[in-house]
């Protein structure tokens, strides 16, 4: 096989031929070393997304991200509650609020996130408004985790080489393969992940990627496309434990929760979403507080169950609905 090059890889993707793990790693190194042009990066992201990713292609991309990540001394005994973004609904920051609730339940949380590339407001924008500093050093981030049992990894600090592709992602303004990478490339690789995926074909792919890396957790997607475990529609859930993936179907009714409409979960800019979070945590009642509260509680429960599965694989008994209700 000839050595990788952009013309070879792009021609291959346009012909809907899969890359090898080696080829996708080569492309990611070119990007992270600053050797790819914006045209090459944009063409690569669009062509790969259009073809549809494979487990090996994602693995090659994530391999290189982790090789270049800034290391952190926290250990990995924790859960990351995270979504790929890209559902384009503009809801409040469910996974960020759920992470705080999970930590309040004494489950350690190592949350990895960035600014929104294709949506309205990402986790970091809201957390910044709430007074969370994004420029902390790795040592300071680790100290916060030691003290509070929860910390936030701002992706640009821990994946500095991703700065080369960030402007292109923003210019494109649509979900790409790179939406999948952040949740998989948490620099400490926590033992558990509760991962929401908006893309229908991407959700089982992400479960297979966790399986490939020997990680545990829950991957979920709402039938309406939300990257959350949702009360707005039924959900598909992939439970990953000990190298196995088990598929479940879950609805609000199964869990004793009221169904709602996406319009009841819509957020705004970072300030508006931060205001929702502070009101929710202070027990204030506000417009749509009940459906938002239910969503936050449900996704926090997903984080607790994911962590339980990682700590005690025998708990992955198939009774997912019972565990989420508990």
Question: What residues fall within each predicted segment?
Answer:
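A glycine-rich phosphate/pyrophosphate-binding beta-strand-loop-alpha-helix module
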Residues: 45, 92-148
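Glycine-rich anion-binding loops and their surrounding alpha/beta cores
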Residues: 2-5, 12, 18-19, 63, ...
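N-terminal small/glycine-rich loop or linker at the start of catalytic domains
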Residues: 2-15, 79-84, 110
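Active-site cofactor/substrate anionic-group-binding motifs, chiefly glycine-
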Residues: 52-113
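Short beta-strand segments at enzyme active-site cores
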Residues: 40-41, 109-112, 219-220
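N-terminal glycine-rich anion-binding loops that anchor highly charged ligand groups
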Residues: 2-4, 11-57, 66-74, 295, ...
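Residue-level signature of catalytic and energy-coupling elements of molecular machines
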Residues: 44, 86, 127, 182
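Acidic, glycine-rich active-site loops and adjacent beta-strand->loop/helix elements
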Residues: 83-88, 113-119, 158, 223-224
């Amino acid at each position: 096989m000839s050595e990788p090059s952009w013309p070879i890889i792009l021609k291959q993707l346009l012909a809907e031929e899969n890359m090898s793990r080696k080829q996708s790693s080569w492309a990611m190194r070119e990007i992270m070393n600053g050797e790819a042009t914006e045209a090459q990066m944009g063409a690569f992201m669009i062509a790969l997304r259009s073809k549809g990713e494979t487990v090996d292609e994602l693995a090659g991309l994530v391999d290189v991200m982790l090789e270049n990540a800034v290391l952190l001394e926290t250990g990995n005994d924790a859960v990351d509650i995270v979504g790929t973004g890209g559902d384009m609904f503009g809801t409040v920051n469910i996974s960020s609020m759920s992470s705080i609730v999970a930590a309040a339940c004494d489950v350690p949380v190592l949350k990895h996130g960035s600014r929104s590339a294709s949506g309205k407001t990402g986790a970091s924008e809201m957390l910044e408004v709430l007074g969370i500093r994004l420029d902390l050093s790795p040592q300071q981030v680790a100290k916060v985790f030691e003290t509070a049992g929860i910390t936030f990894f701002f992706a640009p600090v821990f994946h500095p080489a991703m700065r080369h592709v960030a402007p292109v992602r923003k210019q494109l303004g649509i979900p790409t393969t790179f939406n999948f990478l952040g949740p998989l490339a948490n620099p400490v690789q926590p033992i558990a992940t509760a991962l929401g995926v908006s893309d229908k074909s991407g959700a089982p792919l992400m479960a297979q990627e966790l399986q490939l890396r020997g990680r545990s957790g829950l991957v979920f997607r709402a039938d309406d496309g939300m990257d959350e475990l949702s009360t707005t529609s039924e959900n598909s859930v992939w439970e990953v434990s000990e190298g196995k993936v088990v598929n479940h179907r879950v609805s609000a009714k199964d869990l004793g929760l009221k169904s709602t409409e996406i319009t009841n979960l819509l957020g705004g800019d970072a300030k508006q979403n931060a205001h929702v979070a502070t009101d929710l945590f202070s027990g204030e009642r506000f417009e749509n507080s009940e459906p938002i509260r239910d969503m936050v509680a449900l996704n926090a429960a997903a984080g607790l169950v994911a962590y339980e599965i990682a700590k005690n694989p025998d708990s992955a008994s198939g009774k997912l609905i019972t565990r989420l209700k508990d």
